[in-house]
Amino acid sequence: MGKGGFTLPGESGYEELTLKMAEKWGADVIRDSDGTVLSDEITHAGYGIYSTICIIRDHNAWAKENQDKLQQTFLCTPPQAAESDTLTIGLMDSFFAEQFRINDSAESLEYWEVYDRTTNVKIDNADWSYDKEKGSVSLSGIIPFHKYTVSFLAYRIWEEISMYNHTTNHWDKEHLMQIDPRYPETQEYLLGWMKHWCETHPDTTVVRFTSMFYNFVWIWGSSERNRNLFSDWGSYDFTVSVPALQ
């Protein structure tokens, strides 16, 4: 058959099959996929090479040293009924601890909100306090049997496509974090990383950007029986941060 207009996924370790199918189906380009790489045998076989990169993940070494530069989101606790004029709400009780970590910096706390959901009235900051050690918010002077919520900023500590591949494709490797390109330090790091990537991938003819900066919003719960709390496959929930709000 003719050659051209067809891109074939390939993978290191499957050279013979990849090149056989490329010839049989008339591929003009071979590409990698999330979690796969192409061997020299494939990249030097005379085909165009598409290389996949996600700018904001797979930088765990840098992310571990700059954990205040991770992407964030707002989380809101489920409404909880008060049985007296005081109430304590565990912020992460309903959320997946492998995905989120509370951002309890002084700058972040300025944007936390506690609401009486029965009356839809915001609780004054003087009427609640945060316990860092317990990860909980305690309310006082509230109305018994009204329901209350806390919205707070949380760091994302497990990138969602990495989560998806672990749970769907049974990956068994380090959880990938995602970094936020809004920060000047992150931008400087990423520009250097991109320059190095281009220099070390001379066989690449097309770069396939995937997931870009913020995408694929998954918010998982702590209960295995109710893991998927919210999903949106094209969203901006994860663009928020203290610098963005400022």
Give the location of each predicted region.
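Glycan-processing catalytic domains of CAZymes
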Residues: 1-246
